[in-house]
């Protein structure tokens, strides 16, 4: 993010000339009062908010996954069908593999047979590379870890907390480079919270998490991005508790605190 600012139509400025980058392995907790600009910043990173000043530059080939506070799910699908969307590429490969195998039962000449065998080999290699043969086990482990409802349960029957868990499960299976979570601990129980912590701690990319749960942030955050009022944003390297200690030491210090700039996904 290069010089990013955002002013709403009522002239309220929530972001003011922010320079910010992320890097693999970082777990960044975003804190601040409601209305301070946290969700706006996240939507800009996700590419959902286009009306802002400045520039957002991404490394080639990056992927971003975003969990909103109220996830949008297809109510016509089952829990498993929604979770499968997180492995869409593998699902498509397996479907084509079955279709190719079925074609071997059809009459064909030698040239057609050779092409079919070649395609079958390509699909087998691609599925092997993605460990796609274990799709059912992968989905089951992911759903169990986040205590998702029964796989056959229609999404339209889920509670708000259940929808959030299903959406989070789908998102983690996508394995994006940058993972954006807006209040992921809302409406989840202690066991699901533990699973979320484990998933984030094992996540290889950069995770950016908005949360009012200070205890949760202290367990997962390697950095804190704090909206401290008057459009002032502080980027701190360390846990939430360490940030709080640093903030207490800064009380009475009039030196301006600027967001540190780091190279993103080089």
Question: What is each PLM-predicted segment?
Answer:
Residues 1-266:
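ABC ATP-binding cassette signature C-motif
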């Amino acid at each position: 993010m290069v010089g990013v600012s955002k002013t709403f139509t009522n002239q309220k400025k929530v972001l003011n000339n922010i320079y910010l980058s992320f890097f693999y392995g970082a777990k960044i907790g975003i804190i601040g009062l409601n209305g301070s600009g946290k969700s706006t910043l996240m939507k800009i990173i996700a590419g959902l908010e286009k009306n802002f000043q400045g520039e957002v530059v991404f490394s080639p080939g990056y992927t971003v996954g975003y969990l909103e506070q109220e996830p949008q799910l297809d109510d016509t699908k089952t829990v498993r069908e929604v979770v499968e969307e997180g492995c869409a590429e593998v699902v498509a490969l397996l479907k084509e593999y079955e279709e190719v195998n079925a074609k071997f039962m059809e009459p064909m000449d030698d040239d057609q047979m050779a092409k079919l065998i070649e395609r079958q080999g390509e699909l087998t290699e691609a599925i092997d590379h993605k460990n796609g043969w274990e799709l059912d086990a992968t989905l089951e482990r992911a759903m169990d870890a986040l205590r998702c409802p029964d796989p056959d349960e229609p999404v339209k029957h889920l509670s708000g907390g259940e929808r959030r868990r299903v959406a989070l499960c789908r998102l983690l299976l996508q394995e994006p480079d940058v993972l954006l979570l807006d209040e992921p601990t809302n409406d989840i129980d202690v066991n699901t919270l533990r699973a979320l912590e484990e998933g984030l701690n094992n996540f290889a990319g950069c995770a950016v998490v908005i949360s009012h749960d200070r205890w949760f942030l202290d367990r997962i955050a390697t950095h804190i991005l704090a909206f401290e009022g008057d459009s002032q944003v502080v980027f701190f390297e360390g846990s939430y508790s360490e940030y709080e200690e640093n903030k207490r030491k800064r009380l009475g210090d009039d030196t301006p605190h600027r967001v540190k700039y780091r190279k993103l996904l080089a």
